[in-house]
Amino acid sequence: VLGALAAAGFSIDRPFPHWLAKAYRGGYYIDVIYSSGNGIARVDDRWFEHAVAGEVLERPVRLVPPEEMLWSKSFIMERERYDGADIAHLLRALASTLDWRRLIERFGGYWRVLLSHAVLFGFVYPGERDRIPAWVMETLVGRLEQDLRTPSSDERICQGTILSRQQYLPDVELWGY
């Protein structure tokens, strides 16, 4: 993509090489996003395999699959930007059509983040919490129950920097995590 944009006369900048490039020409720019800022939700072939057909400005396009949108937005918990409301709205609108097995698989070892959003969804929309299938909640809560039966590691780990690039820096820089 960047090569094609460069060949079309765009200048390319990579302000965050691990996830974002920008292409500029005249007064216009295009963000080329190929991962999440934390490096977890990398754009891979599955984004394209499951893309949703749509139309933008009367042009046919392939849109990000809802599962990948949920996955990538779920980790955005900055002081100045929290995508939790977006997650709740996406779940309210699309929970019945989601490929929940694929979504759970996408979260992998970060399943607690998905569980936290599912729990918050039940708080935000208590009368609609059954939009999230019971087996999904049972699976995630089952993982939590199993985790609680496993002794904690002695290793000092702070995964907060996966959720916020700034808010957990004291943990890493000052408190020994």
Q: Whereabouts are the PLM-identified features?
A:
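Compositionally biased terminal segments of proteins
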Residues: V1-Y177
